[in-house]
A protein has these predicted regions:
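Bacterial Sec-dependent N-terminal signal peptides
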Residues: 1-27
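Structural scaffold elements adjacent to functional motifs in cytosolic proteins
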Residues: 55-57
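Rhodanese-like catalytic fold shared by cysteine-dependent sulfurtransferases
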Residues: 21-44, 50, 61, 65-92, ...
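Short, surface-exposed ligand- or partner-binding patches at beta-edge/loop junctions that are enriched
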Residues: 97
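Short alpha-helical patches at coil-to-helix transitions and adjacent helical residues
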Residues: 6, 104-105
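Conserved G/P- and acidic residue-centered "switch" motifs that form tight phosphate/ATP-binding loops
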Residues: 101
Length: 164
């Protein structure tokens, strides 16, 4: 019986740590199912300065206009073209993101095929970024609004104002 109690305690501790880290176990499971385990990711807590990356937003224009990472360049997803990144340095790290990381991973793979050497997907996308208390911007100013792609996806945003 003691071993069973210890197991339950350990489970609650692990789940509690996941929530304390700003990310639920279901969200982590979702991301694990969406991501290619061979594609490199960077977690928000690993980023000390966005200026060390060429930051690309792979969401649609309306999502970008609601808010985006401060130094992000909009490249889109449905309308993405390598012409939109022609001026970027293929040897400098690229950080690409979308809402949760699925669309950005797809565009990231296209960048790798085009010769970009260091492409990283932002783990958890803009939702995880904001849930970690990191800022987003609109028209050069901080904002609390975050486009969540759609109402069903908005359940994963725990901080900020949901827009869809």
């Amino acid at each position: 019986m003691t071993q069973l109690r210890l197991s339950f305690l350990l489970c609650f501790l692990v789940l509690g740590l996941q929530y304390a880290a700003g990310q639920s176990l279901p969200y982590q499971t979702l991301l694990k199912g969406l991501y290619d385990s061979n594609f490199p990711v960077v977690k928000p807590e690993q980023i000390t300065d966005l200026k060390s990356y060429q930051v690309l937003d792979a969401r649609e224009k309306g999502e970008f206009q609601v808010s985006h990472l401060q130094t992000a360049k909009w490249v889109g997803h449905e309308t993405f073209s390598l012409k939109s990144v022609a001026e970027l340095d293929k040897n400098k790290p690229v950080l690409i993101y979308c809402t949760v990381g699925a669309r950005s991973e797809e565009i990231g793979k296209t960048l790798q095929k085009a010769g970009f050497k260091k492409v990283f997907n932002l783990y958890g996308g803009i939702l995880h970024w904001v849930n970690e208390g990191r800022p987003v911007f609109a028209n050069g100013k901080p904002t609390l609004q975050v486009h969540t792609y759609s109402k069903p996806w908005s359940i994963w945003l725990t901080k900020g104002e949901k827009v869809y």
